[in-house]
Amino acid sequence: MSLTLLPAVDVRDGKAVRLRQGESGSETDYGSPFEAARTWVEAGAEWIHLVDLDAAFGTGNNRDQLREIVHELGDRVNIELSGGVRDDASLDAALEAGAARVNIGTAALENPDWTASVIKKYGDRVAVGLDVRGHTLAARGWTREGGDLFETMKFLDSVGCLRYVVTDVAKDGMMSGPNIQLLSEVAERTDAKVTASGGISKLDDLRAIKELAEIGVDSAILGKSLYARAFTLQEALEVAK
């Protein structure tokens, strides 16, 4: 079974950045978000994971810039939009921009009724981001705790969630390897598909994630590993086949 790869473009103050462990202020600047996204498309990406960090942290938004990226590249690549989607206005803006899929995070923890309604309405166009420390969820830009992972999943499964994007916060941007145990625990507890995020640092990490395909881990987000040139996207796509 093949693994779908989603190169990440995280946007802060109009620039493409990478954070360490999701902490505001830890970013490394990688220049133009549009150029970053275009680079991954030209290298063969079928999906881009596009994140508005300002919206996630509540420090403004980069909505116009993200909309422009979707508009310019959306006919060549599927775009998953993430960051600060927690109400009808932000969800509608993301969907109207042309995103193939939208990740909701904090909202799923703070407003379960709303989350249930959008999962019912939009189905597989909505994924829920589960940002985890241990078995505890981290909320709003990872600065607050949001309850037990498996209790939250039980609720989300009951309302028909079809995809989880699972990030081990301690691993994100640290190039220290993915949390295979966490991914296995999540995938074994749900019929939903699982996207792995955080910690991927070498091609063997992708091989390890690919072995979880039969229990429902069908995709992986690549961030720091690509920007730090640990491997090329072409090499990763070859492994993911």
UniProtKB/Swiss-Prot annotation:
Disulfide links within the chain: none
Domain of life: Bacteria
GO biological process: L-histidine biosynthetic process; L-tryptophan biosynthetic process
CDD domains hit by this protein: HisA (cd04732)
This protein's GO CC annotations: cytoplasm
Pathway: Amino-acid biosynthesis; L-histidine biosynthesis; L-histidine from 5-phospho-alpha-D-ribose 1-diphosphate: step 4/9
Catalysed reactions, as listed in the record: 1-(5-phospho-beta-D-ribosyl)-5-[(5-phospho-beta-D-ribosylamino)methylideneamino]imidazole-4-carboxamide = 5-[(5-phospho-1-deoxy-D-ribulos-1-ylimino)methylamino]-1-(5-phospho-beta-D-ribosyl)imidazole-4-carboxamide
Transmembrane segments: none
The enzyme's E.C. designation: 5.3.1.16
Molecular function GO labels: 1-(5-phosphoribosyl)-5-[(5-phosphoribosylamino)methylideneamino]imidazole-4-carboxamide isomerase activity; phosphoribosylanthranilate isomerase activity
Keywords: Amino-acid biosynthesis, Cytoplasm, Histidine biosynthesis, Isomerase
Catalytic machinery residues: D10, D131
Primary site of residence: cytoplasm
Subcellular location: Cytoplasm
HAMAP family in the cross-refs: HisA
Family, as annotated: Belongs to the HisA/HisF family.
Protein name in the entry: 1-(5-phosphoribosyl)-5-[(5-phosphoribosylamino)methylideneamino] imidazole-4-carboxamide isomerase
Species of origin: Bifidobacterium longum (strain DJO10A)
Classification of source organism: Bacteria, Bacillati, Actinomycetota, Actinomycetes, Bifidobacteriales
